[in-house]
């Protein structure tokens, strides 16, 4: 579960020319090597995949749904904040006749997007996605010597990849067989087969594509394959994908007239938290351990929480969020820059995920954690606005260094973050 390179390989056909394309789980953008089309993958909900059964297998296939979750989990405990990287799957049928998880199947088998052309029967999905975390924690508690879950005030999940995977099985002599392994599923009870198995007809195939052309000027949008934010270098605009098309994103850049600079994205979120009377930077200094020297002339500043707009390991995510929120970067920015020649690190964490991280950052900033953390579940976060800020970092051999504040980020940490 802690293998950071445990993503899937997905096989797809180019919707324009039909050529085969291979994707990784975290990819949002693909380019066809044949017709050169470049498309952004979107969905109106969870993406649905299936594991193809062996072609030589001559059986009536029954597909069983499994929830798949990959991301960072933050648990608020009496002892403090604990985090871990999760990579798990869970049977979504509501019965225990099949394996409870997919195990290593998604790493050893190539997946495909679920499509109307797929033949077979589908077991009904009964367990909603928001119920799987309680089941995961129950399993964790049974296996752990320390019964921590009873003291969890709240959980926050950041940077998650969530999908529904259909695994192939078949029935033979009143037993379920794993179609990939071509072997019977181990029995979990004396009752080997219920009188009936609930099936469903899949009607929603919620995957579609957007052309990566700027809606404003028609130029090619720039972004790496993992990017959730795309940049137009022609009209100097920034865009995010949605089910209804690309939408413009407000952004700022701290421009530096130097070479060897990479601009790294962070979300800057203006926030009011009425339950804690937090509206300004002075309010934050009141409940946080912020030195007076850092608070000079800032009493009336609006409160902004910061978060990386890219995926990184939880320790680094917390450090960057806390550091920029307590001592935000002060300097001249522009939202109408000439960005055609600038080097941008890809934004892989959407604004919705950054907003989810506000309580996590708050729990690390406040002095009286025993008082604040238990009430975090009931605290309402009122987001006024959010801005994508590109901060300049000087490129070094093994790290990048923030130009103004001089903190560093290891290049390997950024590389690993792209696989989360």
Could you say what each language-model-derived stretch is?
Residues 2-16, 20-23, 27-420:
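Long C-terminal interaction/binding lobes of large macromolecular proteins
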């Amino acid at each position: 579960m802690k293998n950071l390179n445990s993503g899937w390989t997905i096989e797809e056909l180019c919707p324009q020319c039909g050529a085969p394309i291979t994707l990784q789980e975290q990819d949002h953008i693909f380019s066809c090597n044949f017709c050169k089309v470049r498309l952004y993958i979107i969905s109106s909900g969870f993406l649905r995949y299936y594991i193809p059964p062996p072609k030589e297998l001559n059986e009536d296939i029954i597909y069983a749904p499994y929830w798949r979750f990959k991301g960072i989990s933050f648990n608020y405990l009496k002892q403090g904040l604990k985090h871990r990287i999760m990579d798990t799957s869970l049977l979504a049928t509501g019965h225990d006749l099949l394996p409870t998880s997919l195990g290593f199947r998604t790493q050893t088998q190539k997946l495909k997007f679920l499509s109307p052309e797929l033949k077979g029967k589908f077991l009904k999905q009964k367990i909603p996605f928001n119920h799987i975390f309680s089941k995961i924690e129950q399993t964790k508690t049974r296996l752990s010597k320390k019964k921590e879950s009873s003291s969890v005030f709240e959980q926050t999940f950041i940077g998650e990849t969530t999908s529904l995977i259909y695994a192939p099985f078949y029935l033979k002599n009143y037993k379920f067989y794993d179609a990939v392994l071509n072997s019977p599923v181990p029995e979990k009870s004396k009752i080997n087969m219920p009188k009936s198995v609930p099936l469903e007809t899949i009607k929603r195939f919620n995957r579609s594509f957007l052309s990566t052309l700027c809606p404003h000027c028609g130029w090619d949008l720039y972004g790496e394959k993992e990017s959730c934010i795309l940049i137009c270098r022609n009209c100097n605009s920034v865009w995010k994908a949605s089910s209804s098309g690309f939408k413009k994103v407000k952004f700022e850049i701290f421009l530096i007239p130097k070479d060897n600079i990479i601009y790294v994205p962070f979300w800057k979120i203006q926030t009011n938290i009425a339950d804690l009377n937090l509206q300004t930077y002075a309010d934050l200094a009141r409940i946080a351990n912020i030195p007076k020297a850092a608070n000079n002339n800032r009493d009336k500043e609006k409160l902004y929480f910061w978060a990386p707009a890219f995926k990184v390991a939880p320790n680094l995510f917390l450090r960057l969020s806390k550091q920029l929120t307590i001592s935000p970067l002060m300097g001249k920015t522009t939202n109408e820059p000439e960005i055609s020649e600038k080097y941008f690190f890809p934004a892989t964490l959407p604004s919705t995920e950054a907003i989810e991280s506000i309580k996590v950052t708050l729990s690390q900033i406040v002095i009286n954690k025993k008082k604040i953390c238990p009430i975090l579940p009931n605290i309402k976060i009122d987001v006024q606005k959010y801005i994508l800020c590109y901060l300049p970092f000087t490129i070094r051999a093994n790290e990048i260094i923030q130009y103004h504040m001089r903190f560093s980020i290891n290049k390997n940490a950024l590389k690993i973050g792209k696989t989360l």
